[in-house]
A protein has these predicted regions:
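Hydrophobic h-region of N-terminal signal peptides that target proteins for export
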Residues: 5-16
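Substrate-recognition/specificity elements adjacent to catalytic centers across diverse enzyme folds
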Residues: 19-236, 244-246, 251-259, 264, ...
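Solvent-exposed, acidic/flexible segments
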Residues: 102, 113, 117-128, 228, ...
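Acidic, low-complexity N-terminal propeptides/linkers enriched in Ser/Thr/Asp/Gly that mediate export
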Residues: 120-226, 231-232, 378, 390-394, ...
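Glycine- and hydrophobic-rich flexible loops that cap the catalytic core of alpha/beta enzyme folds
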Residues: 246-257, 263-267, 272-415
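Hydrophobic alpha-helical segments
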Residues: 251, 336, 380-489
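Proteins synthesized as precursors that undergo proteolytic processing into mature forms
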Residues: 357-383, 390-391, 463-515
């Protein structure tokens, strides 16, 4: 960090300093010494470039900088991860906390911390020290729950995905079992994706896009990587973290974690996408009560059900109260519900110390071999990974935790827990999964779809693998789109890959609109819909199936698509089809046309006319730093051209109207986006939704909104020579 020293020596940067305490405690003195080993440089976008003498120092600075930008999100992630949300939010979160506590036990995590290797323990110590020093130097910040961070807590949130495996457990069914509330069994709260699937409502797609291009397909013969996570907005921060011990990672870090989750260093880059791998299993346990104890059948024996007590504190108007639960486990895992007289146990990957090791060590990988070595830890359970490196290697890793199972069972459904043949037998190695290294196509991708099209003709073959390696049974619209923009091209560059990532084609409508047009054409002239829909049909007939801020057909198609799939969803579910496919193949002409009439009426009612440009509907707005954002049609907002990814848009913007609004506001989709070129030196461009800071008064709260909305990625300042002309502040933790 010679650049920083020169700038300070020349007096070009002013560093605000906090007055030292007169009588610091020993802990405060220790933290101040540690802080002096850390330098934080904020660039002209407010992005922190953190440097520490050791990796532990760098971790200290990284989490300190995150706390500066949005302590609320940092704390909330760990409140949730440790099952303490009810302490902040009250009684309504009791069963969410119980779900977490079934898997996350403080005593177990403390023991794992104590037995961790010294290098990992040092990182966890630096993590806790950085957050505690932030709180000590910012007494105006009042934590909701966690007033003091302990090193073991880092193990409670050791993998950076937006939706962890634990969240697959349905809350209502958990409450029905443990809360003695049988009515909850049939209730749908809308808090779990499973609830919406059961109602036949298409979910807003979550996940991500990852693309790697081999040198043979690029203009400058350098590997390229697209990093395009689709998450809720402001879920991750953009950072760079470096040390004198070889750490030098740039990318997106989930608030509160000390590793770059999706990003790159000078040698390699990695991108995770949500996977269709079957990594979680449910077991139907045959349980009998003998006396006052429960036993479950396993093979020819009856084993005792393990019983323990979990206590969940919760906030009330007069202080904390608590609710205790007797919880049950078999060797398969905790009991999470009852089904047809059987208890259901769930088994999933739960190895926090190993997961934290993998999450961190991959950020220091220097080539494919060392990256693959970290992947053999098999703890990134819910994700696929796209990889590229400076040597020109590109790779696809399908899932990262696939238990080896007996293929005769249907593992997408609960299996008989009494049958010993349903046991796991280790996990599949990387080479036993649908894995790709340097495919002859010269490209590979994943958009949360199956791996059977990951590299065009070079893709893995479905018949070579057991069914449980992938649960998807059809190609996704984004998958079709990705193949279209990646195939048969040898002229990729950073700019060309960015353009592909924002290509405006909507493949779903290219399939859905023609049956609608045919239905209209078959209408007799006397039908009232013939005249009512004539102009709308003309717009859709002339449309090129591409989104754009000025596009009226985009507005009409999206409103119609939502309406027609909503109408056919119950029947589609009954016959085992997606609503989109049902609308294409089986919807009646009347259903299609009535949905278009309803969509037109909705547009007219909300916006004054059905002929409304997409820019007047689809908006990005950031008014406050609240985790659950408020929206207001009277407030400032930015038009966004790209749509929800459910229609096949690679660039994703999950938007809808909110109470009191007519306009649609986005809350998920494209978040951190980067394109990286691995040449003799790294070159990258990136953008973050809104801005780096979570504070509404910061100049970096919403300074990237226009770039975000238009896909105008900015240059990344990876090297000190780049950062030199774009530095806003340089300081040690505690000095501002």
């Amino acid at each position: 960090m010679k650049t920083i020293a020169l700038l300070l020596a020349a007096g070009l940067l002013s560093v605000p300093r906090q007055l030292p305490l007169r009588n610091p405690t020993p802990e405060r003195s220790r933290l101040e010494r540690e802080a002096r080993n850390v330098t934080i440089t904020r660039d002209s976008w407010g992005i922190p470039h953190v440097h520490g003498k050791t990796d532990a120092d760098a971790v200290f600075g990284l989490v300190y900088a995150q706390a500066e930008d949005d302590f609320n999100r940092v704390e909330t992630n760990f409140i949730n991860a440790m099952g303490r949300l009810a302490e902040a939010e009250g009684e309504r979160e009791i069963y969410r906390d119980l779900r977490m506590k079934l898997f996350i036990d403080p005593d177990t995590l403390k023991a794992q911390y104590a037995s961790s290797p010294e290098w990992l323990k040092a990182l966890m110590n630096g993590w806790a020290d950085g957050l505690n020093y932030y709180l000590q130097t910012h007494p105006d910040v009042k934590p909701r729950v966690i007033g003091h961070f302990e090193p073991w807590m880092a193990l409670s949130f050791s993998e950076g995905s937006i939706g962890g495996d634990i969240e697959r457990v349905n809350l209502d069914r958990l409450e029905a079992f443990y809360g003695n509330h049988p009515e909850a069994e049939g209730r749908t709260s809308g808090t779990d994706e499973e609830d919406e699937r059961e109602m036949g409502i298409p979910n807003e797609p979550t996940g991500s896009n990852g693309v790697a291009i081999a040198p043979a397909n690029t203009v400058d013969h350098h590997a390229l990587l697209l990093i395009n996570p689709h998450t809720s907005f402001f879920f991750r921060a953009e950072v760079q973290v470096t040390s004198d011990e070889g750490l030098d990672a740039y990318g997106a870090v989930t608030w509160g974690q000390f590793f770059v989750y999706q990003g790159f260093n000078e040698h390699v880059g990695w991108m995770h996408t949500s996977s269709g791998v079957d990594a979680i299993d449910e077991y139907l346990e045959t349980v009998e009560k003998h006396g006052d104890k429960y036993f479950y059948k396993y093979g020819n024996e009856w084993r005792p059900v393990t019983v323990s007590t979990i206590t969940v504190p919760y906030k009330t108007g007069t202080g904390l109260l608590s609710k205790s639960f007797a919880v049950y486990r078999t060797h398969h895992g905790p009991i999470i519900r009852e089904q047809n007289g059987k208890w259901v146990a769930v088994r999933l990957m739960n190895s926090p110390e190993k997961a934290l090791t993998q999450s961190y060590t991959r950020t220091k990988a220097r080539d494919y071999k060392s990256f693959k070595q970290s992947m053999e830890l098999h703890t990134n359970s819910s994700n696929n990974t796209i990889f590229a490196d400076k040597d020109g290697d590109i790779a696809y890793f399908h899932g990262n935790f696939i238990p080896r199972r007996n293929p005769k069972f249907d593992w997408t459904k609960p299996v008989d827990g009494s049958d010993t043949a349903t046991e796991w037998h280790g996990v599949l190695s990387v080479d036993e999964t649908p894995h790709l290294l340097n495919p002859t196509s010269g490209w590979l991708y994943n958009s949360n779809n199956w791996p059977w099209s990951a590299a065009g003709a070079s893709s893995p073959k479905r018949g070579d693998y057991p069914a449980y390696v992938e649960t998807g049974n059809e190609e996704s619209w984004r998958g079709y789109h990705a193949i279209r923009v990646l195939s048969n091209r040898k002229n990729f560059s950073i700019a060309a890959l960015r353009a592909a990532a924002y290509d405006s084609y909507l493949p779903a409508f290219e399939k859905m609109i023609p049956p609608l047009l045919a239905s209209y054409d078959q209408l007799p002239a006397s039908d009232p819909l013939k005249a009512k829909l004539a102009d709308q049909i003309a717009q859709l007939r002339a449309w090129d199936y591409r989104w754009g801020v000025a596009s009226v057909p985009t507005s009409l198609a999206v409103f119609w698509g939502e309406e027609v799939t909503r109408r056919v969803a119950p029947e589609a579910r009954r016959v085992g089809m997606s609503p989109d496919q049902y609308a294409i193949e089986r919807a009646t002409p009347q259903q299609r046309l009535d949905a278009l009439a309803a969509a037109s009426d909705k547009l007219a009612a909300d916006f004054g006319a059905w002929k409304t440009a997409w820019r007047d509907i689809n908006r990005f707005q950031r008014l406050t730093g609240d985790i659950v954002q408020p929206f207001n049609d009277a407030g400032p907002s930015t038009p966004v051209g790209f749509t929800s990814s459910r229609w096949g848009s690679l660039a994703s913007f999950g938007a809808r109207p909110y109470p009191g609004t007519k306009k649609w506001y986005g809350t998920s989709g494209n978040s951190f986006v980067a394109v990286v070129e691995f040449g003799d030196s790294i070159r990258a461009i990136a953008v973050t939704a809104g801005g780096e800071s979570g504070h509404a008064g910061s100049p970096h709260f919403n300074d990237e909104a226009q770039r975000y909305a238009t896909g105008n990625l900015r240059e990344v300042y990876f090297y000190p020579s780049q950062l030199k002309a774009h530095t806003e502040k340089v300081y040690h933790p505690g000095e501002r």
